[in-house]
Amino acid sequence: MADKEFLLTQEGLDQHKEELEFLKTTRRTEIAEKIKVARGFGDLSENAEYDEAKNEQAQVEERINYLENLLLHAKVIQDDENQKDVVTVGSTVTYKNLNLNKEMTYQIVGTAESDPFAGRISNESPTGKALLNLKVGDTTKVETPGGIVELKVLTVKKG
């Protein structure tokens, strides 16, 4: 199976690199110290501190592996000046939900950076997919868990 390409903004790439560095240095050292201290408590078969530290170590190693793979296959989104008024990955788009008569603003990002509560939706989400390649004034319909919603693009900003 081919490895998936991860679309990232430059900001997202930098954040993931910073997290990886932190996990590989600071967190690994902290957890190794916890394991060392827990071993000092004696019998490992009934040592809750040791078990907890080993579980934490496994979680950190899993996250490190994920981040290394993500960064290996990352593609940084480049602003295309020829498409400055078209919604692309990396664009910040303000649209109106015509069903609710409510304006919303989100940045369209790759799945690895998606965080709707922080104003970032995935290009693979139903709304993200529906907005891609639209221009200011365009409308589209998107199927959501709550039913079909009509959206109208109000503004598009790059970067």
From Swiss-Prot:
GO terms of biological process kind: DNA-templated transcription elongation; regulation of DNA-templated transcription elongation
InterPro entries linked to this entry: GreA/GreB_C_sf, TF_GreA/GreB_CS, Tscrpt_elong_fac_GreA, Tscrpt_elong_fac_GreA/B, Tscrpt_elong_fac_GreA/B_C, Tscrpt_elong_fac_GreA/B_fam, Tscrpt_elong_fac_GreA/B_N, Tscrpt_elong_fac_GreA/B_N_sf
Pfam families listed in its UniProt record: GreA_GreB (PF01272), GreA_GreB_N (PF03449)
Keywords: Coiled coil, DNA-binding, Transcription, Transcription regulation
Parts forming coiled coils: 10-75
Top-level taxon of the source organism: Bacteria
Single annotated GO MF: RNA polymerase binding
PANTHER family: TRANSCRIPTION ELONGATION FACTOR GREA
Family: Belongs to the GreA/GreB family.
HAMAP family xrefs: GreA_GreB
Protein role: Necessary for efficient RNA polymerase transcription elongation past template-encoded arresting sites. The arresting sites in DNA have the property of trapping a certain fraction of elongating RNA polymerases that pass through, resulting in locked ternary complexes. Cleavage of the nascent transcript by cleavage factors such as GreA or GreB allows the resumption of elongation from the new 3'terminus. GreA releases sequences of 2 to 3 nucleotides.
Protein name, as recorded: Transcription elongation factor GreA
Gene from which this protein is expressed: greA
